[in-house]
UniProtKB/Swiss-Prot annotation:
Pathway: Purine metabolism; AMP biosynthesis via salvage pathway; AMP from ADP: step 1/1. Residues 30-59 are annotated as: NMP. One of its GO terms (cellular component) is cytoplasm. Catalyzes the reversible transfer of the terminal phosphate group between ATP and AMP. Plays an important role in cellular energy homeostasis and in adenine nucleotide metabolism. The lineage of its organism: Archaea, Methanobacteriati, Methanobacteriota, Stenosarchaea group, Methanomicrobia. It is found in: Cytoplasm. It comes from Methanothrix thermoacetophila (strain DSM 6194 / JCM 14653 / NBRC 101360 / PT) (Methanosaeta thermophila). InterPro entries: Adenyl_kin_sub, Adenylat/UMP-CMP_kin, Adenylat_kinase_CS, Adenylate_kinase_lid-dom, P-loop_NTPase. AMP binds at residues 31, 36, 57-59, 85-88, 92, 159, 170. This is Adenylate kinase. PANTHER family: NUCLEOTIDE KINASE. One of its GO terms (molecular function) is adenylate kinase activity. Its EC number is 2.7.4.3.
Amino acid sequence: MNIVLLGPPGSGKGTQAKMIAEKFNVKHISTGDILREHVRNGTELGKEAKKYMDAGQLVPDSILIGIIKDRLSKPDVAGGYMLDGYPRTIPQAEALDKILPELKQKIDVVLNIDVPDEELVRRLSGRRMCKCGRSYHIIFNPPKVPGKCDECGGELYHRDDDKEEAILNRLKVYKQQTQPLIDYYTKAGLIANINGAGEINQIFDEISKVLSKFQ
Protein backbone atom coordinates (compact mmCIF):
# COMPACT_ATOMS: atom_id res chain seq x y z
CA MET A 1 0.00 0.00 0.00
CA ASN A 2 1.45 3.35 -1.10
CA ILE A 3 0.16 6.55 0.50
CA VAL A 4 0.59 10.30 0.03
CA LEU A 5 -0.02 12.26 3.25
CA LEU A 6 -1.23 15.88 3.13
CA GLY A 7 -2.03 18.24 5.99
CA PRO A 8 -1.46 21.87 7.00
CA PRO A 9 0.96 23.02 9.72
CA GLY A 10 -0.60 22.12 13.08
CA SER A 11 -2.69 19.25 11.69
CA GLY A 12 -0.78 16.63 13.70
CA LYS A 13 0.45 15.05 10.47
CA GLY A 14 3.81 14.02 12.00
CA THR A 15 2.11 12.16 14.87
CA GLN A 16 -0.33 10.40 12.53
CA ALA A 17 2.52 9.50 10.15
CA LYS A 18 4.36 7.65 12.96
CA MET A 19 1.20 5.77 13.95
CA ILE A 20 0.39 4.83 10.32
CA ALA A 21 3.94 3.58 9.69
CA GLU A 22 3.80 1.42 12.80
CA LYS A 23 0.34 -0.09 12.41
CA PHE A 24 0.37 -0.61 8.64
CA ASN A 25 4.06 -1.45 8.33
CA VAL A 26 4.77 1.12 5.62
CA LYS A 27 7.99 3.14 5.28
CA HIS A 28 7.55 6.78 6.30
CA ILE A 29 9.40 8.81 3.66
CA SER A 30 9.86 12.43 4.72
CA THR A 31 11.17 14.52 1.82
CA GLY A 32 13.06 16.84 4.17
CA ASP A 33 14.85 13.90 5.80
CA ILE A 34 15.94 12.20 2.57
CA LEU A 35 17.05 15.53 1.08
CA ARG A 36 19.25 16.22 4.13
CA GLU A 37 20.60 12.65 3.94
CA HIS A 38 21.72 13.16 0.31
CA VAL A 39 23.40 16.46 1.26
CA ARG A 40 25.10 14.82 4.27
CA ASN A 41 26.33 11.87 2.19
CA GLY A 42 27.60 14.14 -0.59
CA THR A 43 25.78 12.28 -3.39
CA GLU A 44 25.59 13.88 -6.85
CA LEU A 45 21.97 14.89 -6.20
CA GLY A 46 22.92 16.06 -2.71
CA LYS A 47 25.71 18.30 -4.05
CA GLU A 48 23.31 19.82 -6.59
CA ALA A 49 20.65 20.40 -3.93
CA LYS A 50 23.18 21.96 -1.52
CA LYS A 51 24.04 24.71 -4.03
CA TYR A 52 20.43 25.90 -3.94
CA MET A 53 20.02 25.42 -0.20
CA ASP A 54 23.19 27.41 0.55
CA ALA A 55 21.86 30.24 -1.62
CA GLY A 56 18.59 30.19 0.33
CA GLN A 57 16.67 29.00 -2.73
CA LEU A 58 14.12 26.22 -3.18
CA VAL A 59 15.57 22.96 -4.51
CA PRO A 60 14.27 22.54 -8.10
CA ASP A 61 11.70 19.84 -8.88
CA SER A 62 14.14 18.09 -11.24
CA ILE A 63 16.49 17.38 -8.31
CA LEU A 64 13.68 16.53 -5.87
CA ILE A 65 12.14 13.93 -8.17
CA GLY A 66 15.60 12.36 -8.60
CA ILE A 67 15.91 12.05 -4.82
CA ILE A 68 12.36 10.62 -4.54
CA LYS A 69 13.00 8.12 -7.37
CA ASP A 70 16.23 7.00 -5.72
CA ARG A 71 14.40 6.41 -2.40
CA LEU A 72 11.47 4.57 -4.01
CA SER A 73 13.93 2.26 -5.79
CA LYS A 74 15.23 0.87 -2.48
CA PRO A 75 14.13 -2.68 -1.54
CA ASP A 76 12.79 -1.62 1.90
CA VAL A 77 9.75 0.06 0.28
CA ALA A 78 8.52 -3.18 -1.29
CA GLY A 79 5.94 -3.58 1.51
CA GLY A 80 4.55 -0.08 0.91
CA TYR A 81 5.41 3.51 1.79
CA MET A 82 3.98 6.86 2.81
CA LEU A 83 5.21 10.06 1.15
CA ASP A 84 5.21 13.03 3.52
CA GLY A 85 6.18 16.46 2.14
CA TYR A 86 6.03 15.42 -1.52
CA PRO A 87 4.31 16.22 -3.81
CA ARG A 88 3.43 19.80 -2.82
CA THR A 89 2.49 21.12 -6.27
CA ILE A 90 0.85 19.90 -9.49
CA PRO A 91 4.19 19.73 -11.42
CA GLN A 92 5.60 17.56 -8.61
CA ALA A 93 2.53 15.29 -8.69
CA GLU A 94 2.89 14.96 -12.48
CA ALA A 95 6.60 14.14 -12.13
CA LEU A 96 5.70 11.46 -9.56
CA ASP A 97 3.04 10.02 -11.91
CA LYS A 98 5.72 9.71 -14.60
CA ILE A 99 8.26 7.78 -12.53
CA LEU A 100 5.88 5.39 -10.72
CA PRO A 101 5.16 3.15 -13.76
CA GLU A 102 8.95 2.82 -14.31
CA LEU A 103 9.19 1.52 -10.74
CA LYS A 104 6.09 -0.69 -11.22
CA GLN A 105 4.37 1.24 -8.42
CA LYS A 106 1.23 3.31 -7.97
CA ILE A 107 -0.29 5.54 -5.30
CA ASP A 108 -3.27 3.81 -3.65
CA VAL A 109 -4.64 6.67 -1.57
CA VAL A 110 -3.98 10.33 -0.74
CA LEU A 111 -4.87 11.14 2.87
CA ASN A 112 -5.79 14.80 3.36
CA ILE A 113 -5.98 15.79 7.04
CA ASP A 114 -8.41 18.67 7.13
CA VAL A 115 -8.60 21.00 10.16
CA PRO A 116 -10.53 24.30 10.47
CA ASP A 117 -8.30 27.40 10.54
CA GLU A 118 -9.45 28.48 14.01
CA GLU A 119 -8.39 25.10 15.46
CA LEU A 120 -5.01 25.30 13.70
CA VAL A 121 -4.47 28.82 15.09
CA ARG A 122 -5.37 27.55 18.60
CA ARG A 123 -2.87 24.71 18.30
CA LEU A 124 -0.05 26.71 16.74
CA SER A 125 -0.39 29.99 18.65
CA GLY A 126 -0.19 28.21 22.01
CA ARG A 127 3.46 27.29 21.59
CA ARG A 128 5.96 28.92 23.96
CA MET A 129 9.73 28.61 23.73
CA CYS A 130 12.63 28.87 26.15
CA LYS A 131 16.12 30.03 25.15
CA CYS A 132 17.42 26.65 26.39
CA GLY A 133 15.57 24.96 23.50
CA ARG A 134 12.61 23.47 25.42
CA SER A 135 9.19 24.12 23.93
CA TYR A 136 5.80 24.11 25.66
CA HIS A 137 2.16 24.55 24.76
CA ILE A 138 -0.17 26.55 26.98
CA ILE A 139 -2.99 24.02 26.43
CA PHE A 140 -1.40 20.67 25.52
CA ASN A 141 1.95 20.80 27.34
CA PRO A 142 1.99 23.69 29.84
CA PRO A 143 4.99 24.41 32.09
CA LYS A 144 4.58 23.73 35.83
CA VAL A 145 4.86 27.47 36.56
CA PRO A 146 3.14 29.67 33.95
CA GLY A 147 5.67 31.56 31.81
CA LYS A 148 8.70 29.72 33.29
CA CYS A 149 10.75 26.84 31.87
CA ASP A 150 10.65 23.59 33.91
CA GLU A 151 14.28 22.82 32.97
CA CYS A 152 16.14 26.07 33.57
CA GLY A 153 13.58 28.49 35.05
CA GLY A 154 14.06 30.80 32.06
CA GLU A 155 11.37 33.20 30.84
CA LEU A 156 9.21 31.66 28.08
CA TYR A 157 8.60 33.68 24.94
CA HIS A 158 6.14 33.66 22.03
CA ARG A 159 7.92 33.36 18.66
CA ASP A 160 6.80 35.86 16.02
CA ASP A 161 5.91 33.07 13.59
CA ASP A 162 3.66 31.49 16.26
CA LYS A 163 1.52 34.63 16.48
CA GLU A 164 -1.95 34.60 14.92
CA GLU A 165 -1.23 36.89 11.97
CA ALA A 166 1.85 34.91 10.92
CA ILE A 167 -0.01 31.61 11.31
CA LEU A 168 -2.95 32.78 9.17
CA ASN A 169 -0.43 33.85 6.54
CA ARG A 170 1.27 30.43 6.58
CA LEU A 171 -2.11 28.71 6.26
CA LYS A 172 -3.08 30.96 3.33
CA VAL A 173 0.15 30.05 1.50
CA TYR A 174 -0.42 26.35 2.28
CA LYS A 175 -3.97 26.48 0.88
CA GLN A 176 -2.95 28.34 -2.28
CA GLN A 177 -0.28 25.72 -2.89
CA THR A 178 -2.19 22.61 -1.85
CA GLN A 179 -5.76 23.17 -3.06
CA PRO A 180 -4.83 22.52 -6.74
CA LEU A 181 -3.08 19.33 -5.59
CA ILE A 182 -6.19 18.20 -3.68
CA ASP A 183 -8.28 18.89 -6.82
CA TYR A 184 -5.76 16.93 -8.93
CA TYR A 185 -5.96 13.85 -6.69
CA THR A 186 -9.74 14.20 -6.29
CA LYS A 187 -10.07 13.97 -10.09
CA ALA A 188 -7.87 10.87 -9.99
CA GLY A 189 -10.25 9.35 -7.41
CA LEU A 190 -7.49 8.99 -4.81
CA ILE A 191 -8.39 11.55 -2.13
CA ALA A 192 -9.63 10.51 1.32
CA ASN A 193 -10.50 13.57 3.42
CA ILE A 194 -9.86 13.02 7.13
CA ASN A 195 -11.42 15.19 9.83
CA GLY A 196 -8.36 16.28 11.80
CA ALA A 197 -10.19 18.38 14.41
CA GLY A 198 -10.65 15.63 17.03
CA GLU A 199 -8.41 13.73 19.45
CA ILE A 200 -5.29 11.97 18.13
CA ASN A 201 -6.75 8.44 18.51
CA GLN A 202 -10.08 9.48 17.02
CA ILE A 203 -8.31 10.83 13.91
CA PHE A 204 -6.18 7.69 13.69
CA ASP A 205 -9.30 5.48 13.85
CA GLU A 206 -10.71 7.33 10.85
CA ILE A 207 -7.41 6.95 8.96
CA SER A 208 -7.26 3.24 9.88
CA LYS A 209 -10.75 2.63 8.47
CA VAL A 210 -9.68 4.16 5.16
CA LEU A 211 -6.35 2.30 4.99
CA SER A 212 -7.74 -1.11 5.98
CA LYS A 213 -9.53 -1.19 2.60
CA PHE A 214 -6.15 -1.32 0.85
CA GLN A 215 -4.57 -4.11 2.88
